[in-house]
Amino acid sequence: MIGIIDYGMGNLYSVSKALERLRYEYIISDDPKELKNAKGLILPGVGSFKDAMHILRETGLAKFVCEAVNEGTPLLGICLGMQLLFDESEENGLTEGLGLLSGRVVRIPGVTADGNRYKVPHMGWNRLVFRHPSPLLQNVEEGHVYFVHSYYVVTDDDDVVLASSFYNVEVPAVVGKGNVYGTQFHPEKSGEIGMKILQNYASIIEGKGSM
């Protein structure tokens, strides 16, 4: 069973519907006691990093997530949920994240080196470019996936970046280390590629994919 963490800022409906299409059992909960029964976790997210971390800390979910990961439970962060996995974000002032992966979340510049402006938020379909092999990307094609974001991750740990996309800057699109994974894009809105990634994550949870 997959536990979808409900902290009031997630795209719960689309994620749960994707899991239903794949016929995977799931629960949606804000209760660590219920979520503890899940074999793997999904941390969705839409909105402000600062607000999300405040809620996660106030509800005890931040502590629960970190403890679950340390105990070996697989975790997948989606969009803002992926950003929350990292050390900190500069959105609305510097805010400490979950610190499960090394890196900082910064704003997409919106201006090229030549001074030309481009649209932020980054909204639409962009192509994946694979960087490192991962069970999360097994039998996944380097096709287009759907992004909606104004911030992106910068990290000195190149091994964490499993796949990138480009929006004037290189955007870590899929990240992973140990039992912690994340996608900056929305797999549940990314057609066959996104569904395959969710399917691979479920296989990781079931122990069919190597971590």
Swiss-Prot record:
The EC number(s) this enzyme carries: 4.3.2.10, 3.5.1.2
Domain Glutamine amidotransferase type-1 as annotated: residue spans: 1-211
GO annotations of cellular component type: cytoplasm
Tagged with keyword Cytoplasm: yes
Superkingdom of origin: Bacteria
Claim: Transcription regulation is one of the keywords in the record: no
Pathway assigned in UniProt: Amino-acid biosynthesis; L-histidine biosynthesis; L-histidine from 5-phospho-alpha-D-ribose 1-diphosphate: step 5/9
Molecular function in Gene Ontology: glutaminase activity; imidazoleglycerol-phosphate synthase activity; lyase activity
Catalytic activity: 5-[(5-phospho-1-deoxy-D-ribulos-1-ylimino)methylamino]-1-(5-phospho-beta-D-ribosyl)imidazole-4-carboxamide + L-glutamine = D-erythro-1-(imidazol-4-yl)glycerol 3-phosphate + 5-amino-1-(5-phospho-beta-D-ribosyl)imidazole-4-carboxamide + L-glutamate + H(+); L-glutamine + H2O = L-glutamate + NH4(+)
Subunit structure: Heterodimer of HisH and HisF.
Protein name: Imidazole glycerol phosphate synthase subunit HisH
Species for this entry: Geobacillus sp. (strain WCH70)
